[in-house]
Amino acid sequence: NQKRLALKEENYPRCIVRECCCMNPYKMVIAVANQKGGCAKTTTAVNLAAALAKGSKKQGLPPSKVLLIDLDPQGNCATSFGVEKKKVKKTAYDLLANESGEDLPLMDEYLIPPKQLTESMQEAWSMRNGGKKAPTNLSVGNLWLLPSDIHLSGAEIELSHKIGRETRLREALAPIIDNFDHIIIDTPPSLGLLSINAMCAANWVMVPVQAEYYALEGFSMLMNSIKMIQRRINRNLKIFGIAMTMVDARSKLSRHVCDQVNSKMPKKLFKTTIRRLVKVAEAPWSGAPTVLLNKPTNSGAGAGSLEYWTLAKEYHHRVLAMRREFGVNEQPRLLLERKNRM
């Protein structure tokens, strides 16, 4: 079975995905991917999704409707919002490995809505702070989550013999893609069938790269894998941006890795870098992403929050520039709503 799951070109016929549900390049379906673990994929996906959904006038970021999809069997996206895994009834595993019939079930049945995410964050914060009332900033009104759990690790084997196994997520997204401004997919630290599903459903890839030596080798391997997926599975897939994470400005090695990535893909590298900060790592324990938990400041507990807010703003500006390039001045969801009112 492991051989069948290996990502080899001969396993996938050319242009297996001829029509993607997100053919339009201005639709933001973005896979946060890197086959190397420990590069802050989940932290980046969670904080980016939360910042885009929350919005901030001070940061110059309007609120957006966001869907966060967790395709990592560790299920840390739910934990980041204080959701107890034992209380989650339906997950990405139930959606992708559904056996009830040929058609996939409606995806919205599997999503945790904003109200439940807000309640989970506030309950988790209160429980870990001696029963105190949670601060009002621990709320998010525009974010939906498709959670995962450890059962998802078996989905690759279960799906390996199924026709269209690479397109399960794409098919599930098709009916709801226009309901959201951004769909962000967190992927596992490997390039198996789950990551392939993410990159088949997406039209963009965002790559967090850890500012350490081994990251350079992993980065080159990932670029080759993305090129193969573009040729064989999803020709609409493009690299949206590369974010340097775990950066230590005092380290010569960190600066060297950042310079090397910049020399390879200068137009794709985000100007914002994410430092290795304890408060960012501690935030999930409090049951909320750092962008919601900590007020953005230049130092102290809010430094990591400021960096992720800045990254979200840079992401937003890239999206606006891309949409202007394609002659689109509004978010796709707003265009659809205007059309429906006419």
Which sequence ranges carry the predicted segments?
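P-loop NTP-binding core
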Residues: 2-342
